[in-house]
Amino acid sequence: QQKAIRFWLFEKGNPDHIIGTMSIQRISRGIFQSCVIGYKMDAAYRDMGYMTEALHFLISFIFTELKLHRIEAYVNPDNNASIHLLKKLEFTEEGIAHGSAWIQGVWQDHLRFALISGPKS
């Protein structure tokens, strides 16, 4: 059974206004101890640092509370803002996942990024 955790991001001071979401998906235990994250921010709230702040929380939650070892994120190669965000958060680009997402009737490639818990080598 697929397990996932979703977080809703609210505008500060306005808990009725959702401005974004984050999710932890494909949580794998056993030998892998990994997950995949997804995130989305309302266009009006981009470039304000909110998603950076939220993902710092999410990364800490995954490594500290869930005690996972590896976080993966898949990004459309044209999504420069998301690529920049992941690199700022010290994710490493690992390559291309060819034909990994069925979007608008077409199998599309995505870049795979990963972050490993513990000290960076």
Language-model-detected regions and their locations in the chain:
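Active-site rim helix/loop that mediates acceptor-substrate recognition in acyltransferases
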Residues: 1-4
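Acyl-donor (CoA/ACP) binding surface of acyl/acetyltransferases
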Residues: 6-121
